[in-house]
Amino acid sequence: MKKKLSLSFILPVSIILFIFLVLKVWPFGDKTILVIDSNTQYVSFINYLKTCFFGTNDFKYTFSATLGQNFIPLLGYYLMSPFNLITIFFKPENIKMVLTIIILIKIGLCGVTMEYYLQKKYPDKKTLLFSLSYALMSYNIFYMYHLMWLDAIILFPLIILGIDYIFEDKKPTLYIFTLALSIIFNYYIGVIVCLGSLIYFIYKLILENKNKEIIKFKVFIKYSISSLLGGFLSMFILLPSFFGLSSSKAVFSLSNLKFDILIPYFNVIAKMFTAATGNGETWHGGPMIACGMVIFILLIMFFLNKKIPKRNKIINAILLFCLATTFVVKPLDLLFHGLNTPNCFDFRHAFIFVFFEIIIACNSYMNLNYNKDDLKKVSIIICLISIIIYLYKFKFNVSTYGLTILLSFIIMIIIIHFLKKNKNISKVLLIIAIADLTINTTSGILTNIMPDKQSNSEFKNYVIKVDNIIKTLKEKDNSLYRMEKTFDREENINKNMLSINDSMIFDYNGISHFDSVTNKEVEKLMEKLGFRRLLTRAYYNKNGSTITSDMLLSIKYILSKNEYKNYTKIIQEEDLAIYQNPYYLSFGYKIKNDNIDIESNNPFLNQNNIVKAFTGINEDIYEYSPYTISYENVKKTNDTYQTNSIGILKYKIKITSPDELYFYISPPSEIQTTYKKAKMYINDTYYDDYFTKYNWGVISLGKHQIGTTIELKFEFEEQLEIKDTYFYYENIDILEKHYQELSKNQIDFKKITSSKLEGKINLDKSSKIFLNIPYDEGWTLLVDGEKIKLNPILNTLTSFELPSGNHTLTLTYTPKYSTLGIIISLITLLFSILYIILCDKIWNIYTKYKEIFNYLIIGVLTTLVSLVSYFILSRLLDISNNIYFIIANTISWILSVTFAYFTNKKFVFESKTKGKNALKEAFKFVTSRLATFIIDLVIMFILVKLIKINNDYAKIIVQIIVLVLNYIFSKLLVFTNKEKNKIDKKA
């Protein structure tokens, strides 16, 4: 087996390396596969990991994301793969090379685990063809740059093997720990894996039709307990991540469950063809389920093979149809994505379909026989599918489509020839599969990766240059502050996008950030201050910001390639310079008032309101400038400007002040995904592109002589959507007054770690203190050793009150439920070890006390139904409102009672009542549960509304009480005249 496992690793890696050689991808050239999200996100996040081991950062909190955020959700989503530890020993500029090696290793290991699974299922058979197809499936190739997803793909065959072991009455060790690891390494794909394991378990349970019912029930119990143990083992990362996601983009809406058809069923079949993906389809295309034409042909032959029982064919056909339906029907697709529509990279559960596709094809291969009529049917089916694909113009890479069809018929000819001659066909099919998968892999890289034209050397030179100047700054000033930069990593590609997470590469406290778990409330605040926000991204403006927003957010330094007016240049290295903000304030300072209105879309008005409230000085920094607007070749309808050629939009401003003039045009919608590029001119001189995806914030128009007129002109095509336009002067003298007032009482903070700050402040009287750190229940503030309450301000930041005197402050962050998660994982680990060692003895004890154990198991499952439904509803509804609180609790009760009745009737009390007796029994069951529901409501009201216990904790306490009461009522009052099936004690 060792030789086969080695080949299953070497072969896919060698194929990819050969393609890299031809396409001049690193290590054979300067191109890179690390594009799109891996270039903008993962490179930065993984590099940041090093600072948690060797720097002052830790795994609890980070100030390198927006204004600061809980690091656990980001850690759990992006960084838990053990392969990432390899990167901490390399310099930042080499991170892309290291990650490329890691991707190759992961794809190779996909082949190894699949080969291991197949060898256990088909000992001594030649299965390399199928493990190769798994390793090089389109999912792995097109999503290889999502390297944190690949760990679960590696583990999935082992998880399935673990389920097989459970059916074979072996120890559940493999299943428990591989399932736990898949969730730990990436909880998002881990949840998909859990659903995949459930699908396989049901499939296997139906397929194994010869087993006695008691044995099937034993398997069900063993699988259920093992699944729960695997899930609870991951709670140390899953629990704090889940609660940390409450302010992220992952917000469920009932409107998401609208029944929509995403793609036609035939598209699913088309996507099984080699090179069945066109340009850009990784963003919003069909499922990535191609794994070679050999697999596709063997799959068809499976359903025509007379050696395979008809029942097996029907079960497998239903399975594939159901899996295909998850690509077609929106609510089913959403089920695999946490009930949220993916922003891009659709059908992320496609690897489950591919796995079943391959194991069915492997079964077909093991039962191959020569049947002339069947082989003709296969040829006709392939021909018809090919014609339909061509006629309906599905998105294929046209240059390889002909090769795909030709290859299909070559495969058929070879299969017919070798089967007819009764020769060994495995080596020939493997060679064809290698050629086929090479075409598919090359197509994937060419059409979806290479067009970005990223360069390893450009990235390396950029990182070295920027890292050097930031290190120079840190040697000069190692205090706690924020800094930002105004240039992108590669100016000719996606302006202001590639460098959005540079604060994590270079380990500085920045405000620009993009990830899938960021706090949306912080992003909204940044938008209110005039920064660009787009879905889960927040940007420091390419052309800078206002001095006031820099002051309020503690931005002390700006790294820029251009001269930065009003700031002092302190470092110059090559074409880069660092400028110091003369109006810098620390992370915390004294304010007069915390009741502030920032609901306007006008960032200048919002900034005025904030500083006036903070200082008590009723003078505006920003003064409105009137303007006139005109347009050419444009039709205006409400906020929309449309043109059939080149539209021109002109603003004219007569200068009435010598101060800096700013402008801002608010985007048209809350999520702001609408954008159209327009060329911006100032007095007919091209300045920049505006209304773009990444450049749509406050911009300075400079200082101008009083009495002159400046013209701001936009040239655009098609249409622009503009909600409001603002022109304001920045009065530096008034800004100075506000700054002097705020700078009088600042906290002198010192960073101990990223989750612990220490500071000092001296106050002459009791005062309110403002922290420009996002409000989070995880923060604990000790002042002179005593705990002080923190309050939200500006919807998302933090404030607190202090008495007069000299104070020492300690600010410590502990992610919500992280301690509870660790305790649950440790207890579960102990139970898992005991369960694995004693599982046979436990089963014997179970058969003796079957009713009690079944009730406890069903009780746990019922509790999960209640908890999950309640947690979802409590986040959909405002549970602070008593009506919605009761509605959420009522619906969760109805769902759990329905589940409990049928499961208790069948598995616990084994009631066989029918007709009127069954109705009476159901009535008594519902009545008893209604009684415990009333008890549930009363205790919940007391705990949540009167005692003020956290509603989640309260729900857990109440469920334990209700669990005990329900058993007593069911045993003594409901299932009193039941007839039971006798259990085969010998089983």
Where are these regions (language model features)?
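A cross-kingdom signal targeting lumenal/periplasmic-facing segments of multi-pass membrane
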Residues: I86-T87, V112, Y508-Q642, K650-S666, ...
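Start-transfer (signal-anchor) and selected internal transmembrane alpha helices
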Residues: M1-V25, K218, K222, H417-L429, ...
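Active-site-proximal, structured, solvent-exposed surfaces of multi-pass membrane proteins
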Residues: K2, F45, I621-W843
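Extracytoplasmic/lumenal acceptor-recognition loop(s) of multi-pass membrane glycoenzymes
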Residues: P73, A433-S457, T472-D550, Y584-L585, ...
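Periplasmic/ER-lumenal interhelical loops and adjacent helix-loop junctions
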Residues: T40-L49, P82, V219-I221, G230-K306, ...
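Contiguous transmembrane helix-bundle modules in multi-pass membrane proteins
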Residues: K170, I189, I314-T325, P331-L334, ...
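Active-site lumenal/periplasmic loops and adjacent helix-entry segments of GT-C-fold
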Residues: V22-K121, K126-P157, L181-F185, G280-T282, ...
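Membrane-embedded helix bundles of polyisoprenyl
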Residues: I16-L17, I103-Y117, K125-E208, F220-S247, ...
